[in-house]
C-alpha cells in the first residue's frame, strides 16, 4: 500500500467517523441524564450503535468501500450542517467540551494524590500496552479465526454483508460485534487495528461500573477505585483486544444496568429524571447486545430484579410506572422532528437487535440457527448442528466448573479463560472479602448481588459446561469491584494505618493484574520477536506460530495473491488466516470426503476454480488428511506442494 493510498484511506475513515460521531452527538442531546459520567456512557453507546447501524445498512446495500462510505458520510455531514435544528445542536459542542473538561478536572482534584498518580501511571501503561499488542500481534484467538473475523474478512473483500459457503456454520450467529470490527478493517482493507474494535466496550464497561458505584451512594474517589479495579480484571483486560464478542455483551449489559439503576435512584433523591432518555438508552443497549449474542436474554432477569428492588418495599414498582408515564408525556411534548428522530433510533435498535435472527428464520426456519433450542429435552427449534439447551444438568455442571476454577490457581489466565475465572488478584485478594462485608452492611449491595447471581445462574443454565465457559460472565467481577468501592468509603476514618495498608494492597493487586496480562499470559518472547521482525502490514495471522498449523504459513508463502485458494476444514477450523492481513487472498471451500477418488477430488477443485487445496491437522478431518496424503504418495493428479498444501498437476 503506497503512502498516497494509505493517506486517502485514512481520510475516508476520518470523514466517515466524523459523521458518525457528530450524528451521535445530535442523537445524544435528548437522551442526556444530567450526570456527566452516565452521559459519557450514553454517548459512547450511541457512537457504537450508530457505527454498527451505518455498517449494517451500507453492507446490505453493497456499499462497504472506503470511497462510498466517505461519500455517504460527506453527504450526511452536509445535511447535519445545513439543517437548522442539528446545526444549532452542533454549535454547542465547544461549550459541552469545556464543561466536560471542567467536570473531569473537578473529579481529578477530588482524588487523593496517590490515586491521581496511580491513575496517571495506569492510563499511560494501559494505553501503551493496548497500542503495542494491537500493533505487534495479529488476531490469534480460536473463535475469531474460525468465524468472528471470517465474516469480517469476507465482508471487507466483497464490499457487502452476505452469507457465503463455508463449513463453519457459526457465521450465521448474530454479528453486531463483527459490524464494529468491519469498521476497523474496511477503510484500510487491512486488519492491522482490528483488535481495537473491543476498546469501546472496554471503556463502556469501566465507565458503567463508576456510574453504578455513584448510584449506590459512594463518593467519586471510591467509585473511581471500583472502576480501576474492574479495568484491571485480567479476564476483562485480556478480552478487550481478543477480537471476540463477549466483552461487548458485558459492556452493553453493564451500561444497561447503570442506566436502569440511575432511573431507580432518581426519584428517591429528589433529582429530576429524563425518563424518556433513560428508558430509550437502556433499550438501545439491550438491543445492541441482542444482536451480538443471544445469551443477553439470560442476563435480563437479574437486571430486572435489581431495577425492581433497588428501592425498598413496593416503591420501585410505583417509580417505574411513573417513569413510563413521564416518558410518554415527554414524547408527546417533543416536536415532530424530535419524535421522528427518536423513532428512527428505536427502529435502528430493532434492526440491529433482530436482523440476524430474522434472516436465519427466513433461510433455515430457526432464528437461532446453527443452534437447536431445547428446554429440558423438549425441542423448540430443531434445525441446527449445535444445541442450546435450558437444563438443570447444565447448571449443575457449570457450577461444578466454577467451583473447580475458583481462585485461578489451576492454569494461567489466558484469553479463552481455560480452567480459570480470570478474576485476578483484586477480586480474590480484596473484592471478595469486601463483598462478604458489604452483604452484611448494605441492603443495596445485597440487591445488586442477588441480581448478579440470578444473571450468572441464567447463563449457566444454558451454557455448555466446558473449560472456557467463564468468558460469558466477564461482567460478574464488577460486583466485587463495587463492593470494594463501598468498603473504601465506609472504612473508619480513625484507622489511618489500616487504610494505608488497604491502599498498598490495592496498588499491589492492580500491578499484579496488569503484569500478568502484558503478553496475554501465553505469547513468548520468540513469538513477539518473529512478528516484530516483519513489516507491520505483513504480520499475517497465518504466520503467527502461537496456535497455527504450518500449512497456513505455507499457503502465504507458496500461493500467489491473485490465485484462488481452496481449503477443506471442519466446522471448527481456522478460515480467517487464509485471507491474509490485507484481505488480498480469495478463498473457496472445497468439500470432499475420504471415500472420493483422487480424480474426483481434483475435479471438485477444478469446479471451484482452484489448483490449490489447504488442509491442516486439528482443523481438517483426519480421514480427509489421510486421503490426500495417499493421493500424493501414489503420484496421482494431486501432489503435496508443501506441508498441508496440495496442488493439481
What are these regions (language model features)?
Residues 148, 153, 246-249, 289-299, ...:
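Hydrophobic/aromatic-rich transmembrane helices and adjacent perimembrane loops
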Residues 26, 209-210, 316, 404-446, ...:
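Hydrophobic, aromatic-rich transmembrane alpha-helices
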Residues 33-42, 192-193, 209-234, 251, ...:
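Transmembrane-helix signature of polytopic, membrane-embedded enzymes
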Residues 113-123, 275-285, 300-307, 326-329, ...:
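Signature aromatic-anchored transmembrane alpha helix within multi-pass, membrane-resident enzymes
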Residues 139-143, 148-150, 506-557, 571-575:
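Membrane-proximal, lumen/periplasm-facing interface regions of secretory-pathway glyco-
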Residues 1-107, 118, 463, 601-605, ...:
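Membrane-embedded, hydrophobic transmembrane alpha-helices
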Residues 556-606, 625-633:
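Extracytoplasmic
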Residues 45-49, 121-127, 224-230, 284, ...:
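Transmembrane alpha-helix segments characteristic
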Amino acid at each position: 500500500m503506497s503512502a498516497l493510498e494509505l493517506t486517502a484511506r485514512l481520510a475516508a475513515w476520518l470523514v466517515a467517523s466524523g459523521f458518525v460521531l457528530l450524528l451521535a452527538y445530535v442523537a445524544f442531546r435528548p437522551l442526556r441524564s444530567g450526570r456527566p459520567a452516565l452521559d459519557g456512557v450514553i454517548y459512547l453507546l450511541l457512537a457504537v450503535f450508530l457505527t454498527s447501524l451505518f455498517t449494517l445498512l451500507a453492507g446490505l446495500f453493497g456499499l462497504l468501500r472506503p470511497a462510498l462510505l466517505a461519500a455517504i458520510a460527506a453527504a450526511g455531514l452536509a445535511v447535519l450542517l445545513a439543517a437548522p435544528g442539528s446545526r444549532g445542536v452542533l454549535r454547542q459542542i465547544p461549550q459541552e467540551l469545556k464543561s466536560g473538561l471542567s467536570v473531569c478536572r473537578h473529579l481529578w482534584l477530588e482524588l487523593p494524590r496517590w490515586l491521581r498518580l496511580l491513575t496517571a501511571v495506569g492510563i499511560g501503561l494501559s494505553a501503551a500496552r493496548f497500542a503495542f499488542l494491537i500493533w505487534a500481534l495479529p488476531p490469534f484467538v480460536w473463535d475469531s479465526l474460525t468465524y468472528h473475523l471470517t465474516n469480517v474478512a469476507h465482508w471487507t473483500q466483497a464490499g457487502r454483508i452476505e452469507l457465503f459457503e463455508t463449513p463453519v456454520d457459526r457465521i450465521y450467529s448474530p454479528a453486531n460485534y463483527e459490524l464494529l470490527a468491519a469498521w476497523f478493517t474496511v477503510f484500510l482493507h487491512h486488519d492491522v487495528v482490528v483488535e481495537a474494535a473491543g476498546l469501546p466496550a472496554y471503556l463502556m464497561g469501566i465507565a458503567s461500573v463508576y456510574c453504578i458505584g455513584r448510584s449506590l451512594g459512594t463518593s467519586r474517589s471510591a467509585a473511581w477505585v471500583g472502576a480501576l479495579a474492574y479495568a484491571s480484571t485480567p479476564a476483562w483486560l485480556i478480552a478487550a483486544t481478543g477480537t471476540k464478542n463477549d466483552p461487548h455483551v458485558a459492556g452493553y449489559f453493564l451500561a444497561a444496568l447503570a442506566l436502569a439503576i440511575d432511573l431507580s435512584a432518581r426519584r428517591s433523591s429528589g433529582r429530576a429524571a429524563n425518563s424518556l432518555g433513560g428508558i430509550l438508552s437502556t433499550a438501545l443497549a439491550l438491543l445492541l447486545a441482542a444482536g451480538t449474542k443471544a445469551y443477553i436474554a439470560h442476563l435480563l432477569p437479574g437486571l430486572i430484579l435489581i431495577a425492581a428492588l433497588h428501592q425498598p418495599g413496593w416503591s420501585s414498582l410505583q417509580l417505574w410506572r411513573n417513569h413510563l408515564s413521564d416518558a410518554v408525556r415527554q414524547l408527546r411534548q417533543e416536536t415532530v422532528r424530535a419524535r421522528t428522530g427518536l423513532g428512527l433510533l428505536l427502529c435502528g435498535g430493532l434492526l440491529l437487535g433482530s436482523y440476524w435472527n430474522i434472516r436465519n428464520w427466513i433461510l433455515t426456519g430457526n432464528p437461532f440457527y446453527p443452534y437447536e433450542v431445547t428446554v429440558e429435552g423438549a425441542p423448540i427449534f430443531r434445525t441446527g448442528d449445535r444445541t442450546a439447551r435450558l437444563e438443570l444438568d447444565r447448571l449443575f455442571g457449570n457450577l461444578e466448573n466454577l467451583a473447580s476454577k475458583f481462585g485461578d490457581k489451576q492454569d494461567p489466565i489466558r484469553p479463552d479463560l481455560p480452567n480459570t475465572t480470570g478474576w485476578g488478584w483484586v477480586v480474590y485478594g480484596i473484592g471478595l472479602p469486601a463483598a462478604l462485608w458489604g452483604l452484611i452492611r448494605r441492603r443495596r449491595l445485597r440487591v445488586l448481588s442477588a441480581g448478579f447471581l440470578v444473571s450468572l445462574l441464567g447463563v449457566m443454565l444454558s451454557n455448555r459446561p466446558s473449560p472456557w465457559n467463564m468468558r460469558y460472565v466477564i461482567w460478574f467481577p464488577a460486583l466485587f469491584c463495587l463492593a470494594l468501592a463501598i468498603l473504601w468509603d465506609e472504612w473508619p476514618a480513625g484507622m489511618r494505618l489500616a487504610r494505608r495498608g488497604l491502599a498498598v494492597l490495592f496498588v499491589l493487586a492492580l500491578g499484579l493484574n496488569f503484569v500478568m496480562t502484558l503478553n496475554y499470559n501465553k505469547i513468548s518472547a520468540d513469538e513477539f520477536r518473529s512478528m516484530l521482525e516483519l513489516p507491520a502490514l505483513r504480520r499475517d495471522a497465518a504466520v503467527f506460530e502461537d496456535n497455527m498449523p504450518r500449512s497456513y504459513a505455507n499457503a502465504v508463502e507458496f500461493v500467489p495473491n491473485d490465485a484462488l485458494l481452496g481449503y477443506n476444514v471442519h466446522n471448527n477450523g481456522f478460515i480467517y488466516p487464509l485471507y491474509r492481513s490485507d484481505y488480498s487472498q480469495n478463498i473457496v471451500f472445497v468439500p470432499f470426503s475420504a471415500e472420493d477418488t483422487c480424480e474426483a477430488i481434483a475435479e471438485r477443485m477444478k469446479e471451484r476454480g482452484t489448483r490449490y487445496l489447504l488442509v491442516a491437522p486439528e482443523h481438517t478431518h483426519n480421514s480427509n488428511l489421510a486421503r490426500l496424503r495417499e493421493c500424493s504418495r501414489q503420484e496421482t493428479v494431486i501432489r503435496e506442494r508443501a506441508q498441508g498444501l496440495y496442488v493439481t498437476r
